[in-house]
């Protein structure tokens, strides 16, 4: 069965659907030697040859690919880009290496924002989670500097005009602090550039700290250090897929890795047991000889 080329490439982890559409429009993709056009359809067969910038790439049937998702604790100071010409650290630097796929960031966090950033190998999942029409909640813990009164909170809930259109917080909850340094938890259902900061600035309040603590129902994992990552299990991955109307996965790389670790641990235990038995027998034999 044929599928749209951009969907096949996105699913294979070669970028989000929007990124793939851009490189197709730029004439950087070829199918069986012919430059591809946006909207082309392909059928995955053993002889299919797809190239990006002249490099042959790997694509597989949907059922053959395992969708993987990472939760990463982005520190302040890291850029949400694959490569920085100035050599500054990026969010991709610490991620585990992949074969035949690559990590795609689900949205972005600006350089001075820290917290939860999701990555996936499935470009279609990334695209749907980011798209404003899906209205996936993002929750932030924000420390603000300035006087915050009921009128400002009301404006932030009802909506203020930004340079790229109206915006509002879905929820605002006071979470502590004294004087002009206060913490709030806020939620949005879209991911415009620096939107949280710009909303507060629109009512005359400065943001001094910003942490993303949740994406959908996936929280920033407790105990995860800054710069650390953990892979979501099958239930969490399928929650995200079902949230954006993608079919559930039936297997998970996490389960495979856990099984491997369990098998290795069992092998080590058996080896230790055998070693103990052999050593015990030698000691026993030694005592008999001395007797």
UniProtKB/Swiss-Prot annotation:
GO terms for biological process: enzyme-directed rRNA pseudouridine synthesis. Gene3D superfamilies: Pseudouridine synthase, RNA-binding S4 domain. SMART domains: S4. It is an enzyme of class 5 (isomerase). It catalyses: uridine(2605) in 23S rRNA = pseudouridine(2605) in 23S rRNA. Its EC number is 5.4.99.22. Keywords: Isomerase, RNA-binding, rRNA processing. The active site is at residue 110. Residues 3-75 form the S4 RNA-binding domain. InterPro entries: PsdUridine_synth_cat_dom_sf, PsdUridine_synth_RsuA/RluA, PsdUridine_synth_RsuA/RluB/E/F, PsdUridine_synth_RsuA/RluB_CS, RsuA_PseudoU_synthase, S4_RNA-bd, S4_RNA-bd_sf. PROSITE patterns: PSI_RSU (PS01149), S4 (PS50889). Residues 256-291 are annotated as: Disordered. One of its GO terms (molecular function) is RNA binding. Belongs to the pseudouridine synthase RsuA family. Responsible for synthesis of pseudouridine from uracil-2605 in 23S ribosomal RNA. PANTHER family: PSEUDOURIDINE SYNTHASE FAMILY PROTEIN-RELATED, RIBOSOMAL LARGE SUBUNIT PSEUDOURIDINE SYNTHASE B. This is Ribosomal large subunit pseudouridine synthase B. It comes from Escherichia coli O6:H1 (strain CFT073 / ATCC 700928 / UPEC). The lineage of its organism: Bacteria, Pseudomonadati, Pseudomonadota, Gammaproteobacteria, Enterobacterales. The gene is rluB.
């Amino acid at each position: 069965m044929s599928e749209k080329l951009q969907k096949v490439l996105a699913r294979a982890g070669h970028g989000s659907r929007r990124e793939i559409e851009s490189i197709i429009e730029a004439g950087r993709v070829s199918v069986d030697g012919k430059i591809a056009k946006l909207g082309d359809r392909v059928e995955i067969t053993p002889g299919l040859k797809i190239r990006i910038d002249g490099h042959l790439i790997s694509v597989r049937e949907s059922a053959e690919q395992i969708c993987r998702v990472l939760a990463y604790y982005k520190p302040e100071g890291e850029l949400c880009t694959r490569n920085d010409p100035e050599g500054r650290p990026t969010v991709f630097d610490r991620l585990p290496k992949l074969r035949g796929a690559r990590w795609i960031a689900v949205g972005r966090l600006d350089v001075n924002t820290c917290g939860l950033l999701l990555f996936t190998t499935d470009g279609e999942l990334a695209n749907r989670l980011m798209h404003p029409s899906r209205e996936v909640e993002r929750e932030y813990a924000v420390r603000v500097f300035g006087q915050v009164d009921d009128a400002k909170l009301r404006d932030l809930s009802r909506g203020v005009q930004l340079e790229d259109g109206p915006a509002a917080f879905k929820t605002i909850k006071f979470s502590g602090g004294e004087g002009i340094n206060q913490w709030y938890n806020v939620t949005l259902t879209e991911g415009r550039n620096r939107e949280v900061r710009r909303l507060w600035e629109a009512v005359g309040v400065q943001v001094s700290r910003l942490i993303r603590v949740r994406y959908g129902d996936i929280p920033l994992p407790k105990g995860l250090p800054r710069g650390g990552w953990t892979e979501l299990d099958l239930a969490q991955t399928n929650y995200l897929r079902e949230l954006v109307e993608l079919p559930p996965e039936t297997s998970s790389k996490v389960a495979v890795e856990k099984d491997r670790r369990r098998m290795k641990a069992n092998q080590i235990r058996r080896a230790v047991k055998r070693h103990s038995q052999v050593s015990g027998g030698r000691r026993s034999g030694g005592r008999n000889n001395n007797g």
